Amino acid sequence: MDSSFKRASFKLPPGVNIDNINEMNNNNMNTAPAPAPAPIPTPQPTTTTTTAPQRKVTFGSRVRAQEINATPTPTTPAPAPTTTPSENDTAKKDDFDFDPVPVSRPRATRAATMIPSNMLGDKRPIRPLGKGFIGADRQTPKPETDNNNNGNNNNNNNNNDNNNNNNNNDDDDEDEDDDEYSNVSAPSWNSVLSKAKTNTMNSRKRSGMIHDFVDVNIKNDSGGENSANTTSEDGSSSRRGTLRKAIVIGTHNPQPQQEDDVEETTSRISSLDLANVQRPRPQYHTIDPASIPQWKKNNEDLVNTMEQQQQQPQQPQQPQQQQSTVGGLFNSILKKQPNNNANNAQRLTRAEAEYNEYLTKSKSQRFPEIEALNFIYPAGKDNLGRTIIVIIASHLPVREMDMERVLLYTISIMDPVVEEEYVLVYVHTNMNNSNKPSMAWMKKVYTIFNRKYKKNLKGLYIVHPTTWIKFTLGIFKHFLSSKFWKKLTYIDDLGELFKTFPREQLALPNAIMMHRPAGKKSQPIFGAPLEDVINRPDNPGEIPVLFEKGIAYLSRRGLQVEGLFRLSGANSQIKSLRQGFDQGEDVDLEDVEDVHTVAGLLKLYLRELPSPLFPFDLYSSFIEISKGEQTKPQKVESLKLLLSLLPPANKALSKHLFKFLGKVIENSSVNKMNSVNLSIVFAPNLLKDKEGNVMDAVADAQFVNQVVQLILDNINILFNY
């Protein structure tokens, strides 16, 4: 079977044998054609079967070629036999099972083109079409080369189409249905997509006739050029061909296919599925801008560039695989433009050259006067291994320094660091007008510092920022990328900074450590745990600032004073000093004239510690050493072991306190304060029972004094200094 036809199948009526049909076909080939086909008797269910005529049903438009032509040739159609269906005939019709034929229609209306199942069960007779019965006009001679096509010439006995074949002189395939559509052009998209549902096939409303209502324009002057099946690029099985031709179920011998004369865009459509439609290729027009005076006037720079490129010697280029047909303006766009970044490269080169010049000068010079200011220095590495650079702006007297040398010194410090990732801690504490550099100098620094300064900067911490520094950064907002603002962190409290970097590593000056922003309330020192006081941001050393200042004051002015720590100072002055320290003020003890007031302030601090300098859990151990019968060296070793068990904060304060008391003992000949007298004064403040029982405290007072005296007598051994 030829592959150009759609596959269709049907069931033979009961009692019909395919061998009988083949035998009848052979007899018809050997006999002369009859004027009309003989009626075939209806097979009986209880008798021997007789051959039933082969039904050839044509689905599609039934418009006659004679009706289309302007001057139809008169023909004498043969009378079509009519049959009256009976109950058996109805049953036979119901036995036909035609496969739904795919019709080239959108999916939404495809169901309307299917064969209604109840059509074959209609008891009305099949309406004749004017000549013969259904399929009688589709007579096709059997090709000489096809000897195995069984049943293709069953209708050769019907001679009622001979006149029609003679009248159509331009037809060479003797296929009337194909000729009916030979002058029909391909349907357009609008005619197919806008077809109303009421114009679809409906056999019941058309009295049993099957029609295809596709709007087509008949071209009378096309002749036979557009006839035959389409053989375009879609192939012989294209569904587009079935839209313009009748759909046949039954036997039919097709003629050789011919190409359809359709437009290029229509031939690319393989189906009505819009998702697979190939769009027409875009059309480009060549425009020569040189022929447009107004364009040349408006684009003089582009024309000059093109002329210069034409004058320059062309370098041999590799042959391109595909030559572009675009010319004129589009050629100028597609051609490789000159490097527009040349100016930027020169600008970057000038900046780098200037930076390299400063770097060379910085390596060949020394800056002792700037180095003594200590306004910029590396401070080790953070926990991620990044170098920390600390800048203290208040240490740089701008008005008194040569800022060019300051820039050279800054480059000498920063250049080895910025090769890798680094972190910058900028301390803006205590800034005033004498420390603020000019905007021109800051802009110059920003311009000279090359990309590695900005790229490798992973964190910028601004300590104690003011409105001026925030305003200055706002000015440079348009020159800074969004990544810079993600690296920026404002630090108002040093405690937040010390959570990121160790206090000892940053080594900030005391003036910075003691700074407290305005409006921030300080926590009290007296009565607070020793460890908390030491870890506060405003406490720069390893001991409370109160003790640090007090010991320094007494070392200068109190070692020669008789009765130091034994005599009490003015209670009002002690209270005033305590309030100043608790409020976070920078108390200057040099203004205090009475030495005993400062000594009393230190004893008050030790007395109000929530946990004594020698903790409660070691109280019994100290008492046992004093009560024991060990030798003095053994007791010293035991004390050394207990002192090593002290917390770090307690150990640091004990070391500073007893070191100072050792100096007092050294001057005991003047101040009358030996180890015995000092033990009586400090023992109750250094070692106490947690229970706080007065009777036990009185009973253990002697042993407490003895253990403190033993420590004072062996300060050098116990504290290793």
Swiss-Prot record:
Residue span(s) of domain Rho-GAP: 528-719
User: Which InterPro entries does the UniProt entry name for this protein?
Assistant: CRAL-TRIO_dom (IPR001251), CRAL-TRIO_dom_sf (IPR036865), Rho_GTPase_activation_prot (IPR008936), RhoGAP_dom (IPR000198)
Q: Which PROSITE patterns match?
A: CRAL_TRIO (PS50191), RHOGAP (PS50238)
Q: Which UniProt keywords apply?
A: Cytoplasm, GTPase activation
Q: GO molecular function terms here?
A: GTPase activator activity
Q: Per the database record, which ranges form the CRAL-TRIO domain?
A: 363-520
Q: Which GO terms describe its cellular component?
A: cytoplasm
The Polar residues compositionally biased stretches are 182-202, 219-240
Q: Where is the composition biased (Pro residues)?
A: 34-44
> What's the short name of a Pfam family annotated to this entry?
RhoGAP
UniProt-listed Gene3D superfamilies: CRAL-TRIO lipid binding domain, Rho GTPase activation protein
At what residues does the UniProt record annotate the site feature described as Arginine finger? 566
Q: Where is the composition biased (Low complexity)?
A: 17-33, 146-168, 308-323
What biological function has been recorded for the protein in this entry? Rho GTPase-activating protein involved in the signal transduction pathway.
What is the protein name stated in its UniProt record? Rho GTPase-activating protein gacY
Q: Write the gene name.
A: gacY
